[in-house]
A protein has these predicted regions:
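A short, Lys/Arg-rich alpha-helix, primarily the initiator
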Residues: 3-42
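Helix-turn-helix DNA-binding elements, focusing on the entry/boundary residues of the two helices
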Residues: 45-46
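Recognition helix of helix-turn-helix/homeodomain-like DNA-binding domains
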Residues: 54-71
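Short intrinsically disordered terminal tails
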Residues: 1-4, 19, 131-136
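A general structural motif at alpha-helix termini
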Residues: 53, 64, 82, 95-99, ...
Length: 136
């Protein structure tokens, strides 16, 4: 109980701005960089962006509008984007930077949450193993 209270106190305020708010702001900024990298590579429309990311249009729209859930991009979404053959190199770099930052705790999360995220990111997907989801 004391540990939770201490953590809440540490993250409640710093220089008048919530630490959590700062972390979420950094996370949203990195996701906006991903969107800009797609535009810079010529993927301007939502259809083009969703194809480049290998995601559904609705998922792409939610992510790129930085209105994604508070915990950020899931390991499954990150892996799907990285597996997309149409993903431009700069967008790939932004996703890898986002992943490294998330693992380092830049966007928050306990050590346990970050460890679980790491395990999910590094676990091979059926596509990486040469299987299709249809064959499973």
């Amino acid at each position: 109980m004391n540990a939770q209270r201490n953590q809440a106190q540490r993250s409640s305020q710093r220089n008048g701005t919530s630490v959590v708010t700062e972390m979420k702001s950094r996370q949203a900024a990195k996701i906006r960089e991903l969107g800009q990298s797609l535009i810079d590579a010529g993927f301007v429309t939502l259809d083009q962006q969703s194809e480049a990311l290998g995601l559904a249009r609705s998922t792409t729209w939610t992510i790129l509008r930085a209105s994604h859930k508070g915990s950020g991009l899931s390991a499954a979404i990150i892996k799907r984007m990285l597996l997309s053959p149409q993903l431009p190199p700069l967008a790939r770099r932004k996703i890898l930077e986002y992943t490294a930052d998330k693992l380092a705790g830049v966007y928050g999360g306990s050590r346990t949450q970050r460890r679980k995220f790491f395990e999910r990111v590094r676990r091979a997907t059926p596509e990486e193993a040469g299987l299709s989801r249809v064959n499973l």
